[in-house]
Amino acid sequence: MKPFPLVTLVAVSAMFFSSANAASLQVGDTAPVVSGITETGASLNLGDVYKKQPYTLVYFYPKADTPGCTKQGCALRDGNTELAKKGVAIVGVSADTVDAQKAFKEKYSFPFTLVADPDKTVIKAFGQTGNGLAKREAYLIKDGKIVYKDVGVTDQQANNVLKFLATQG
């Protein structure tokens, strides 16, 4: 009798995680036009950001000032000059508060905007569902469409985006 609850738990977990992954946006999808609150408390409409530069990199991370998220943010900080030369604006998003995002940005001198999304409006708009935290993903957007998706990468995020851009002519 005991194997049944375990089998049920595994089956339900598999459905949960596969449906969460299936909901995530893919290359070719229209990028969500949604607003969030920046680390300064200002409102930021991603649709406006998409129009300002040829590319926008919207990257998601689970929690500010944790090891993997710090590596990811610092890699993008360190690659920001090269990415900016390629016309890439960067926006980071997590479910953290405005104060947590502000402290994270200041501590690591991030030159890009961080969005505080505790109500998960932006996170959900990008199809990220699951345990209440953002999944570590990045979406490169051009002309309102997702042209590249980087999943789960931390310290190589900037390099991966630059490699993709090098293939775009």
Regions from the language model: what does each represent?
Residues P3-V33:
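N-proximal helix/coil linker or "cap" segments that precede and/or mark the start of modular domains
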Residues V34-Y55:
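A short beta-strand-turn-helix
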Residues L57-V58, I90:
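Hydrophobic beta-strand anchors of alpha/beta hydrolase catalytic cores
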Residues Y59-D65, A95:
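Aromatic-flanked redox-active Cys/Sec active sites in thiol-based oxidoreductases
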Residues T70-Y108, V122:
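Structural microenvironment flanking redox-active thiols in thiol-disulfide oxidoreductases
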Residues V91, K105-R136:
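Short, internal strand/loop/helix patches
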Residues A134-G169:
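Thiol-/selenol-based redox modules, centered on thioredoxin-like
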